Amino acid sequence: MAGAVDTSKGLPSHPERATLEGKNKFLGFWFFLGGETILFATFFGTFLGLRGGTADGPTSADLVALDLVFIMTMLLLTSSLTSVLAMFAMKKNNFKAMMIWMWITVVLGLAFLGFEIYEFHHYVVDYQFGFSTSAFASAFYSLVGLHGAHVAFGLSWIIVLLIRYRKSGITLTNAPKFYVAGLYWHFIDVVWVFIFTVVYLMGVGG
């Protein structure tokens, strides 16, 4: 069982693989992300197949405000950068900076979710665009909502880790968990780039 890391010597260059347990968790998580990729690919395929089924209701071109979606995209991409900076800080034994960058990541993620909730509310109230309005609506809310649920889970995960660090410090046992959480967060960001392109840009372009 790994104890607290001697910060005078620093963490190993790859703390996520410094122990056998860490290696197994890291490898297992890559398999998990593979399954997540298949899940999202299925939802993307369903959306592409149903996006024309508007049932005379609103289309993407009617709904989407690219300025709002662009702000959401920048928030999420910036949060990916701050999570990277947090990991760099941890490797340099600057755990205070790591905490700051991770909390900034959380704030940016929460802001993204806030805008997404506002977006959904706007569509429902102003356009009567509910989940059951059309096949397109169901596919839209399923795909974008699935991603939003992943963002919420990722934020919860990071917050739990930050609280655990505050109480117990970084160890060779929990350091890999920060790396895995960061990897998960980057995956969420990549998925959003595809959503931004396929759902919003292609939707506005017809």
Swiss-Prot record:
E.C. designation(s): 7.1.1.9
Record's subcellular location: Cell membrane
InterPro entries from the UniProt entry: Cyt_c/ubiquinol_Oxase_su3, Cyt_c_oxidase-like_su3, Cyt_c_oxidase_su3-like_sf, Cyt_c_oxidase_su3_a-hlx, Ubiquinol_oxase_su3_dom
Transmembrane segments: 26-46, 68-88, 97-117, 143-163, 185-205
GO cellular component: plasma membrane
Pfam family membership, one: COX3
GO biological process, one term: aerobic electron transport chain
Catalytic activity line of the entry: 4 Fe(II)-[cytochrome c] + O2 + 8 H(+)(in) = 4 Fe(III)-[cytochrome c] + 2 H2O + 4 H(+)(out)
Enzyme class: translocase
Keywords, comma-separated and alphabetical: Cell membrane, Membrane, Translocase, Transmembrane, Transmembrane helix
CDD domains membership: Ubiquinol_oxidase_III
Membrane topology: Multi-pass membrane protein
Principal place of residence: membrane
Gene Ontology molecular function: cytochrome-c oxidase activity
Family: Belongs to the cytochrome c oxidase subunit 3 family.
Protein name: Cytochrome c oxidase subunit 3
Taxonomic path: Bacteria, Bacillati, Bacillota, Bacilli, Bacillales
